[in-house]
């Protein structure tokens, strides 16, 4: 199976998330089909970064990871006690200044497929469905001009909003071993 570790340099560093191989790929529509996603372990030990670094999250976030021979699938549930206040900003793809940051509710998943703490690929989406993808080298070099073909869809209801990702393995550089360990960031 695919195993991921958090990429944080503190006590969160060695939290483990396990991805489960699936025979049935989810339909990427932002609606998390229970029959597909129930197989994937729940990742729910998230903390906030603002206003209190590593403080208890003010709203519940849940993530799950599946994979098949060609893709990684990630589901993220963002609970919101005031769903009418979810910020949905339309912008151009990769426009962090306009569609992300504090302007919009958004999530990202990042993979360090070499598990070397030196490179990663980040995939983000805001609550309006606008995408951002970034290649990271080192700790300061973020290349927003890097673009790849991947799919994500969002939906919302009275409990919050949801993101459902489909990312091809062909994007990543990795050694194809039975028990891979990748670095992982979900936020």
What role is predicted for each listed range?
Residues 3-187:
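Structural preference for beta-rich elements and adjacent junctions enriched in aromatics
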